[in-house]
Amino acid sequence: MMAKAAKKKTAAKISGKKPRPHWKKDWKNANKAWDDGLAVRRAMFGPAGAEKQIADTSDFMWPMQDYVTRKCFGETWTRPLLNRKTRSLITLAMLVAMARPHEIAVHVRGAIANGVSKEELSELMLHSIIYCGIPKAVEGFRTAQGVLKDMGLE
């Protein structure tokens, strides 16, 4: 173990470059899950939620960004049994239940891109009152309404 660490330090000294984190080595030449995940993110969130967000990711946040792109969007959102509209509704229901307004806002935009209507969003929030409680549902309503206003849909 110690020899590996010493070898890395020596390689860095020889090249004069700081070693790049192992998870960033070949991300541009990534596998099918990466490509599929990026395509889903682009379709749902546009360039700001795909390429720009990835390009702006720090080395510290890179493992999370890579994992979410491959596993969440590349492998889960692309499974054939549920379409993206249904997945958006399920995702939003879970985010309301967890009271995560930032993620609700992100996924409201994605839901609209996936064909969810504002009436369906309202119905989802109303339905969540029974299962999640009034405070969480109200937070979901407010967050969704703010996003709809920003998008010119409210």
Can you name each region flagged by the protein language model?
Residues 130-131, 148:
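Short Asp/Glu-rich motifs
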Residues 134-138:
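Substrate/cofactor-recognition hotspot
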Residues 2-85, 113, 139-154:
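Acidic, glycine/proline-rich low-complexity segments that act as flexible tails and inter-domain linkers
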